[in-house]
């Protein structure tokens, strides 16, 4: 934060005293001092964005959260004014103009692209506050910034890669934009063959394509490429953990969850939960690594609860709720906690192109279902059965068994009144059933289910993520449902 503060103060010295300083008649050139002030404005807006991001990540009180929001708005207004100017006849095409354009493309593109992902009702509120979100325009601005030789081309490229390989995948319907990501990556991979960040995104692209072994190699190479930035290693560990999850290699996945729990401060509760979850997937008599016990680990999860901007992250809340049953003296085990969390990160889409990986998951679910049916009924029985039905439906959909997948999703929906704890299951079952309808051309039926999932269910686990996916599915159908949109902030 301190270097950013110094940078911000430095740019303040060169900034314009008032907005009118850039108003010129057509053909009238700006002075060198005025041009310098415009570049300082772009740098200042960028600093505000970065400081806001750090505020959201580091500080844990509402006052700091509000301050971060003010920085974001001030940054946006500066970018908006600069964008208006460079589009005007007054804009001077000097030797450094391309760098100013790159900075403005980054800011305008980032705001438009990010805000376009919000559902219409929330976007209307943001537009009232002076923001706007246009996905296509945001993408075009970032592409312009990434493909021209300017100081912000790298930032534009990295933001696009995040969008193509993470945001569209995790908050969308699970496709990702791999072709666009690889096209963008190609020149950077040639220029920086050992660039850690580009190895990471290349690994992410391979994982989305279902090439899990290739992804593992790239993530491992990314770790080897640099040793200074440990947080980057943690990003790779997280991806490696999921890669081994897709392969059902529980011990290796546990190994990376253990590394994260020991080294990373991002979400200790999540890492401990995943460690316990992986151990629970091992056979009862199988030796546990480091002598750890999953029941003890599940009981520890809530002790690592944290708050960001006054609230716990949704993924932590979910993990704590799921682990709560282990507080009992004779706890009822979770049937497939790893696969349930994998669903929350859209992991079943990762294995959709790999029949053998989907089959491995399906067999794990079939065995868990057998154990559940043979066990005495308890207060969690119906919820656990519905978890398995939802996940089996995803596997069957991946295998092309559409009718069987629909039956699984409908079983969850029809059990709505019997579900006691996992209320997220029904809206997600409706979402997945609608995706099946979209894939099979039943557009009107899909829209009805999506609207029902969006409007009839509130205050369930991971609601924001589900609502974003619903919005993405509706956008895919180009359905105008702005009057019914509701969302809980992430």
Language-model-derived ranges and their functions:
Residues 1-187, 208, 220, 228, ...:
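Short coil/linker segments at helix-helix boundaries
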Residues 4-12, 91, 151-156, 196-197, ...:
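Boundary/linker segments of alpha-helical solenoid repeat arrays
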Residues 36, 43, 47-50, 100, ...:
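"A position-specific structural signal for the A-helix of alpha-solenoid helical repeats
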Residues 161, 207, 237, 378-426:
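Alpha-helical adaptor scaffolds
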Residues 215, 221-224, 238-239, 259-263, ...:
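Active/binding-pocket-proximal capping segment
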Residues 298-301, 308-383:
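Extended repeat-based solenoid scaffolds, especially LRR ectodomains
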Residues 424-484:
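C-terminal interaction modules of eukaryotic adaptor/scaffold proteins
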